[in-house]
């Protein structure tokens, strides 16, 4: 995955004078699964529409295989889109839905038969060729939408929140299947999602967006473990963010009257324009007087796979902790963490 198949350079978009994309730049490698992740209204779907050709940017460049993509009409782009609604034709059976694009192109019947059946087998629905769309489950409809897109042999598959209409259990199953399918066929997937867990589990890289700007680009591990700002840290899972700490020097921070080790460097000396993040799952609960701070449990919530515990120290700082152990409200404890689980980042600067 070394070659860029797609590149956006300083792309902007306005609707009725409102700027919805503010200089978007990123690249997509050939064979990569990349997710545009962010809350509703952040601009991620607009980017997908611009790449697909249904909308034009106000400014900027888009290169596909090093050639200007913007003037190429939508029907000439080597992309296919899977929409949230799947956009299947209810009056056609499964075979004819998958074959639709090839039929419109007047492809020979023997080629249609071969390619459609190959894709139906690929998505695990052999034997469903003559079924009507309304006879299919949500997961089966999604597979047919995928087969219909892939039969056209696109170089890039665009996915607009494809799992949004599925229930939680089926969504997880389809996430695994879609990732496996992408790895098997090896083409580039660009997916839009507002689901953090979905993006983390499926993507090679994630483009995190908010209010028309890119907040961070990185692998799932980089996004989760090394967020570039407090907004990303809060959006990708819950976080304990210390906004009033000081970076004393390389590998040393200070807050609430105590000095702690960390693994971060190059933030200067006695620097206060930083935020410090410690994830809830990285905090260790100990018996009183065995940690960095003594604290009292003030809230407990069972989350299914763990307990979420909120404790408050004598400094009146509250900490969110994820643990498999149960604690009682008002129970006295202490808390600590490892230096490698402390993450320092620059404070966000308002433009």
UniProtKB/Swiss-Prot annotation:
CDD domains: ABC_PotA_N. Its main location: membrane. Coiled coil: none annotated. Its EC number is 7.6.2.11. ATP binds at residues 38-45. GO terms for molecular function: ABC-type putrescine transporter activity; ATP binding; ATP hydrolysis activity. Belongs to the ABC transporter superfamily. Spermidine/putrescine importer (TC 3.A.1.11.1) family. This is Spermidine/putrescine import ATP-binding protein PotA. It comes from Mycoplasma mycoides subsp. mycoides SC (strain CCUG 32753 / NCTC 10114 / PG1). The gene is potA.
